[in-house]
Design a protein with these regions (language model features):
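A glycine- and small-residue-enriched flexible loop/hinge signal that marks low-structured segments
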Residues: 1-136, 145, 152, 157-170
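Surface-exposed ligand/attachment interfaces on beta-rich extracellular proteins
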Residues: 139-141
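Compositionally biased, low-complexity/repeat regions
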Residues: 147, 162-215
Length: 215
């Protein structure tokens, strides 16, 4: 079927130029669409998914599941890019579950937003650093690479996309002899809201709301 993993074999293909190896290659049209999609992401940032890869469809799922479990229901909700509004009857409050990865333990990659953010940072820096390929290795080149990464990450930090970061030059003489520069970028993704609590308190129409303001 068109939705199977074999569809790409029989679908339309196009011939493109592989600039890195000076050759022509035949690829699926979906790869062209993916490249364009990545270009939009790099230029505009990640858009909000309208309905997810499953078009928002969740079948035979219950709502009594815990974030981070390995159940089929949890996978369906995450795959469909759906957020859940949950009512906790015992505590009498609502909370809004945002999308999470299926990791059981808390980590930097616990939230889908953090994962997409880090992927976007990696793709953007790769595109920016491509301009320095084939330039002579020198102190000026190292400084230019460092400045490019730092300027971009400073923007990410001021925009609250990361909590903090550190950049280290780990290039050795052996690396230089192999025509390589090595840098280590350590970053802490920003915190993403995973639950938003809302308590609905119903009062009489004659209630004096100034009492709440004084609390």
């Amino acid at each position: 079927g068109a939705d199977s993993y074999l569809a790409a074999i029989y679908g339309p293909h196009v011939t493109v130029t592989d600039l890195y190896n000076s050759r022509k290659v035949v690829i699926g049209a979906d790869s062209i669409a993916t490249k364009q999609w990545l270009s939009v992401i790099n230029d505009e940032g990640f858009p909000y998914a309208a309905a997810g890869p499953r078009l928002g469809t969740v079948r035979n799922a219950t709502v009594d599941w815990k974030i981070g479990d390995e159940s089929n229901e949890a996978r369906q909700f995450n795959d469909a890019s759906m957020n859940m509004l949950v009512y906790e009857a015992r505590q009498k409050y609502y909370y809004f579950n945002t999308q999470n990865t299926l990791q059981l333990a808390n980590s930097a990659f616990r939230n889908i937003g953090a994962v997409l953010n880090v992927l976007n940072i990696k793709e953007t820096l790769a595109r920016k650093l491509k301009d320095y390929i084939q330039l002579p290795i020198s102190d000026d080149l190292v400084e230019a690479v460092t400045r490019t990464i730092s300027d971009y990450m400073d923007g990410c930090k001021s925009g609250n996309r990361v909590s903090d970061y550190a950049l280290n030059n780990e290039t050795t003489k052996t690396d230089v002899s192999n025509n390589e520069l090595h840098f280590m970028l350590t970053l802490a993704p920003a915190y993403y809201a995973q639950k938003i609590y809302l308590v609905v308190n119903v009062v009489n129409a004659a209630f004096d709301f100034q009492i709440l303001q004084s609390l």
